[in-house]
Amino acid sequence: MAQARLAAVYAALLSLFLVPAAKSQQPEQARQREHFANADVQYDFVGNSRGDKLRTFVTKPKNAAGKIPVIFFVGWLSCDSVEYATESDGFGALIRRLIDQSGYATIRMDKPGVGESQGTPCNKADYQGELEGYRAAFDSLKKYDFIDPQKIFVVGLSNGGGVGPLVSGSQHVAGFIAASSWGRTWYEHMLENERVRLTTAGKSPAEVNDAVKAFTQFYNLYLIQRQKPGAILRQHPEWKSLWYDSPDGQYGRPASFYQQLQALNLGQAWQQVDVPVLVIHGSADTIMSRADSFAIAEIVNQAHPGRARYVEIPGMDHLFTVNMQFHSDLVPLILDWMKEALNTPR
C-alpha cells in the first residue's frame, strides 16, 4: 500500500509540473485576471526570433515611490501559465505572496503558446526560443522607470532555477534564487529521475537496475545523439516496455527541447556568478533531487567561496508543500535573504 501511495504521488507531481495542465488551455473569455491587495498588474508583450509574441505580467506595489527592487521569475518546464488568479498550487502561492508581501516590482513571462502568448504551440516550442523570450523580457525591465536596475533578483522555479544566469547574461543581478531546481546535465538528472520513478512504482531493485542500464543507452541516443524516442525504439524494440511517453518528445515538450537542455553547460554558467545565490530544496522533492539542487551551490561556492547558501526544508516537495499545505515559512526566508543580499558588498 505504501508503495502504491508513493507511486500515485509521483504520478500526480509529474502531471502537475511536467505536462500541460488545464490551467494553460482555458479559452481567453474564461481566463481569470489576477488581483492583489498591494500591487497593480500591467500587461505587455515581448518577442523572439521565431516571431512569437510573448505575454508579460509586470506588477508594481500600489504605494511605490521612486525606484524599487524587482523580482524576475523564470518559470518551469511544463506548458502552464505563470498567471495565477488564485493560489491553485504551491508555485502560485509563492508567486502571489511575494507579489503582495515583498514591496518589490515583479515580472513574469508566459512561454510560447501558453495563455495569451502567441506563435509556436508550446508542445512544438524548443528551449532556445523560450530562452530568447526570457532574455527579451529581462531586457524589457529597462522600460519601467520605477525599477531599480541595480536591484534585480532572478527567482527560478523548477527548470527555471537552473537556467537563471543564462537569462540575465552579463547584465547586473543582485542575487539568484534557484528553488526545486537543477545544476547538472539533463542526462544525469533523467537517469536519477527514472530510478526514483521506477522505485516508487514498486519495481524490485533488480528490475530498477536493469531498466536504468537500458535507460543509460536510451538517453544517450535521445539527449546526446539527438534522436527522437520513436526512432530509438524502432532500432531497439526491446526497450518499448520502458518508454512511457510520446515518440516525438516527453512531458508535453518536443525532443529538441530536452536535447537543447542537455547541450547547456550549467557548470560554466553558475561558476561565473559572483553575487549572492540561494538554493532551496525540499527533502520530499521527487522531481529534482538533492544532488540536482546542491550542484548549484557547490559550483558557485567552489568558484566564489561563501556566495551560495543551500537550504533544505524537511518534508517539502517539489510544489513547496509540506503535508499538502504550502510551506508559508518559504516567503519570509526568501524576503529576509533578499534584504541581506542587498546589503552584501559586491
Which sequence ranges carry the predicted segments?
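Alpha/beta-hydrolase active-site loop
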Residues: 124-144
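Short beta-strand/loop motif that positions the catalytic acidic residue
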Residues: 273, 279-281, 285
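Conserved alpha/beta-hydrolase
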Residues: 94-116
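Accessory cap/linker subdomain of secreted extracellular hydrolases
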Residues: 179-272
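Short, surface-exposed "cap/lid" segments of acyl-processing enzymes
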Residues: 63-98
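N-terminal cap/lid segment of alpha/beta-hydrolase-fold proteins
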Residues: 28-66
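Catalytic active-site module of serine/aspartate enzymes centered on a nucleophile-bearing elbow/loop
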Residues: 316-346
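Short alpha-helix in the alpha/beta-hydrolase fold that links the catalytic acid
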Residues: 275, 289-299
